[in-house]
Structures are given as structure tokens and as C-alpha cells.
Amino acid sequence: MAAESGKVDPMKQFSIEPMLGSEGWEIAGYNIAFTNSAAWMALTTVLLAVFVWGGMKGQLVPGRWQMMVESFTSFIDDMLEVNIGKAGRKYVPYVFSLFMFILFGNLLGLLPLGVLGIHPFTFTSHFTITGVLAIISFSIVLIVGFWKHGFHFFSLFVPSGTPLPMIPIIFPIELISFLVRPFSLALRLFVAMMAGHVLLKVLSSFVIDGINAGAGFGLLVGAPSFILMIGISALEILVAGIQAYVFALLTSLYINDAENLH
């Protein structure tokens, strides 16, 4: 952001920039420098580990920290039991970690640290990151499906009661819709987070332009934009939680297909 010139590039915030090892850190021609994206993912992982560790005291009368961790765990446990059944409990560690990792990453990217010279990076606004998370979930679905049901897993793509002549038509349609799942799962989170951050950055450019243009233009454009920024920021906090929940929810539904073939 360049306040002096009043220019704000809304896409600049998504740039992946090397922090360590920008030169000579290559494997098979690919640069493996430690980037801002990796740094914020590492920070998210550390904070998540501290959050969980702090809530594992197992006190008979739990403190606020322990209650918070147990509340999130119970929330995920209940969701999996509703969507999968008793068999869903064994997936609590994964889905809980997935949900919290996305939630922490979304929220960290909203922190107003720019005033301190620190520029938060929302790694969930990159399709490569959300894509990897979706592929991991999809891989678990495939492993569970074939491990538990073998080739009978393919019966998932033929709904019960389908007339025999319709199977050659229904099967490829169901298979394609199944294979598209990781793409749609990743795209949903990526678009939601990216759109919100772009909107906030555009509004911030209006505020800066209003300040630089003088009091009159500032009151006419800058002040309403600033108020709108506050409202959008509050909405983005809500979206951060909703998108983490949706990702975890859809993952649980996909695992249910692998576990129960429906």
C-alpha cells in the first residue's frame, strides 16, 4: 500500500515472496525458498499446536482455555457423528485439525497488523493451498472407500434402484461429479477468502484517496468507505468461520460416502 500516492494494488497482498533462500535453494529446477506463505502457515501450525496443548490439561473443573478446546472438539465430534455415525469418531483428529487450521489461517489474515509494518498473508486465498487441503481430504475418502469396500466402492456411483438401461448413463455422470469434488471444495474456500480481501483493499484505496484529496472529498468518499470497511471486516470474520465449517462439513459428508456408500 502506498499511502503517499494514494495507490493501492488489491492483488499485491496475494503475492508470494521469498523470505529466506531466494538464491540457490532449488530442487530439480524448482525454487524452494521459505516464503511469506510458508511463514504464515508455520505460524498457524504453531499457534494451533499451542492452542490444543493448552487445552489438554484434563482438569476436573476445566478453565476457559480447556473449555474452549473441548467445545471445538465436541463440535467436530457431534458433526461427524451426525454425518457418518459412530464410525465418524475416528476421523475427529483429522477433521478437527483441518477445521482449526483453516479457521486460524483465515483469522490471522484479517489481523490489522499493517500499522506495525507486518503484512498478514492469507494462505487460504491461494488455490494451490486450498487445493492441497482438498486433495488430502479426497485421498482419505478414496483410501477409506477402497480399503473398506474394495471394488464395491464403485457402487457409490450407481444409486440404489437405478434401472439397468440407465446405468451406462448414470455411472459416468456420478463419477464425474465425484471427481470434481476436490476442485469445488478448494475453489469455494479460495474464492470466498480472495474476494473479501480484494474488497477490503479496494475500500482502503477509497479511504486513502479521500484523505489525499482533501477534507471535502474525504468526507464524501473516504468516511463512508471507512465505515463500510468496518462492516465488511466484521462480515469477513464471520465468513472466515463459515468457510472453515463448510470445508470440514463437506469433508465429513464425503467421508460418509466412503464409509457407508451413501
Swiss-Prot record:
Signal peptide: none annotated. F-type ATPases have 2 components, CF(1) - the catalytic core - and CF(0) - the membrane proton channel. CF(1) has five subunits: alpha(3), beta(3), gamma(1), delta(1), epsilon(1). CF(0) has four main subunits: a, b, b' and c. It is found in: Cell inner membrane. Belongs to the ATPase A chain family. This is ATP synthase subunit a. It is a multi-pass membrane protein. Coiled coil: none annotated. NCBIfam families: ATP_synt_6_or_A, PRK05815.2-4. Keywords: ATP synthesis, Cell inner membrane, Cell membrane, CF(0), Hydrogen ion transport, Ion transport, Membrane, Transmembrane, Transmembrane helix, Transport. InterPro entries: ATP_synth_F0_asu, ATP_synth_F0_asu_bact/mt, F0_ATP_A_sf. GO terms for cellular component: plasma membrane; proton-transporting ATP synthase complex. It holds the Pfam family ATP-synt_A. Key component of the proton channel; it plays a direct role in the translocation of protons across the membrane. The chain crosses the membrane at residues 32-52, 98-118, 127-147, 153-173, 189-209, 219-239. PANTHER family: ATP SYNTHASE SUBUNIT A. One of its GO terms (molecular function) is proton-transporting ATP synthase activity, rotational mechanism. The lineage of its organism: Bacteria, Pseudomonadati, Pseudomonadota, Alphaproteobacteria, Sphingomonadales.
